[in-house]
């Protein structure tokens, strides 16, 4: 897994001065381009003009649940039957940890370029949301926020052992959302993740979208825009507020 060929991420530059970054990770079988239209949706009200969006592309790997055929994926999936047990059973730990290292490297590169960690949000959808949640909570720096859409906690049975001490993101706001008609990542797995994280003391907000399957909806995208605007306010706005005091 360490020698995987990776394409550079799709970059959507900030419209104004770059002061914050969002790393948004696609799901199984997709590419970063699959979420480019969502980025435009989030930017349409010009509230995120200072934000650069990074949309990574997963490498093409054999997926066991796809009869071993290659497709874009962040880790192998052994079965897709909609059950919580199937996704938690026999997880591809090596693949998960390889992708985790990749996302931690993306975060570090943003920090090295001058973006503070607390001006970085990481998240994604489905497999990408699972990687965003896992990578964010195990990061060795305090992030601005984490987004997990239609996803779940990876390596949940040993997760506590993998979190660095101190826990930099214990209080970091986590935006979780899930459709209650999801046939791929069962809604129960989403609520189990929410409950487990809350039991461990994490700052989770979970929204249910009635009737939604394994997808996103406009209402959900608007909620994400609000979350990003709250977590990554314009630096110019902050400066203006200080000057008025």
Swiss-Prot record:
Similarity field: Belongs to the AB hydrolase superfamily. AB hydrolase 2 family.
Catalytic site positions: 126, 182, 214
Catalytic activity, as annotated: S-hexadecanoyl-L-cysteinyl-[protein] + H2O = L-cysteinyl-[protein] + hexadecanoate + H(+)
Class of enzymatic activity (EC top level): hydrolase
Domain of life: Eukaryota
UniProt entry tagged with the keyword Cytoplasm: yes
Protein name as catalogued: Acyl-protein thioesterase 1
Cellular component, GO, one term: cytoplasm
GO process terms (BP): fatty acid metabolic process
Protein species of origin: Neurospora crassa (strain ATCC 24698 / 74-OR23-1A / CBS 708.71 / DSM 1257 / FGSC 987)
Chief location bin: cytoplasm
Record keyword Lipid metabolism present: yes
Taxonomic lineage from the root: Eukaryota, Fungi, Dikarya, Ascomycota, Pezizomycotina
């Amino acid at each position: 897994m360490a020698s995987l060929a990776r394409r550079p991420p799709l970059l959507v530059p900030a419209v104004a001065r770059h002061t914050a970054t969002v790393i948004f990770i696609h799901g199984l079988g997709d590419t970063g381009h699959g979420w480019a239209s969502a980025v435009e949706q989030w930017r349409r009200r010009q509230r995120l003009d200072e934000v650069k969006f990074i949309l990574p592309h997963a490498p093409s790997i054999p997926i066991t649940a796809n009869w071993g055929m290659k497709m874009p994926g962040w880790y192998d999936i052994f079965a897709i039957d909609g059950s919580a047990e199937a996704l938690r059973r026999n997880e591809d730990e090596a693949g998960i940890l390889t992708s985790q290292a990749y996302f931690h490297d993306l975060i570090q590169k943003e920090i090295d370029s001058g973006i503070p960690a607390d001006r970085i949000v990481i998240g994604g959808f489905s497999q990408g949301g699972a990687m965003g949640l896992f990578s964010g909570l195990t990061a060795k720096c305090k992030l601005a926020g984490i987004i997990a859409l239609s996803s779940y906690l990876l390596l949940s049975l040993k997760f506590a052992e993998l979190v660095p001490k101190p826990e930099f993101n214990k209080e970091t706001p986590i935006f979780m959302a899930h459709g209650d008609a999801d046939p791929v990542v069962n809604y129960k797995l989403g609520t189990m993740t929410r409950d487990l994280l809350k039991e461990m003391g994490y700052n989770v907000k979970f929204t249910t979208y009635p009737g939604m399957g394994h997808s996103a909806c406009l209402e959900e995208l608007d909620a994400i825009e609000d979350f990003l605007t709250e977590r990554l306010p314009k630096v110019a706005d902050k400066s203006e507020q200080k000057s008025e005091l």
